Amino acid sequence: MSGLLDTMFVWLLDRAMVSSEGSGPRRTRASRRQIQHNRVMRRFRHPLVLLVTLLLAACASTDVRSPLATWVASPNHNVRSPVIIVLHHTDQDNVQQSLRTLRTANSGGRVSSHYLVGADGHVYQLVADNRRAWHAGGGRWGSITDLNSASIGIEIDNDGSSPFAPAQIAALIRLLNDVCTRLDIPRSQIIAHADLAPARKQDPSRYFPWQQLAEAGFGVWPRASDGPAPAGFDPWLALQAFGYPLDDRAAAAGAFHRRFRGRDDLPPTLDAEDARILHSLLSQ
């Protein structure tokens, strides 16, 4: 950056001196040089300051934001680079309460997300895409152990016990399309908060329409046409290969059931239908 400014300054100085050659009465070479220098500095003092300011502004890091969202800044973030998207539900009464929580603090400390999707479909952006929001907490997905550093966090205004509004899901799909396109995130890389932390999180709830999302091209869904898993297929190894942490197998099975079977009441193990689903997912 300093080299560019030096080059431009020398060019401006040279041009100014050339334009002033031959004017005025004869003087010694040294005095002419001093007068020319003074003239140049007077002529270019303010334009040069402006030029330097503009160049510095152009080279500065720019926060990445979505054109679909209302910017409502949260101070709770750091810098990072996203490769995956984590979906949450807010488990709060309304979007204003969620905005307060995501911009200040809650009983467990400061939290934030990049986006919040209201029940009416309005999208709020709280943290720039290139910044590290504090939404995932401890957990793991596949080989990723710091999900905050690797992900975009999207909170969805929902109390956890009600279906998600159609306008809200439509807005979410538009947002996913925008974010995946701009940040070059693979469209299959959309997971639940409960997927990465099954022992402590259950969001989004069983009411979340994962199949609808997959039909729109985001996330993954098993093919209905796929038959049973082959003999010898190990569903637990498959669950781990898919990305789920197995520190607590019962919790991992529960998170899987919630996402792919829409159930919270199944036994905390993996049955033949789970094996079929996992085999289908891993073969895609």
State each model region's role:
Residues 47-57:
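Bacterial N-terminal signal peptides
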Residues 59-62, 165-284:
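Basic/polar, cationic surfaces and motifs that engage anionic cell-wall
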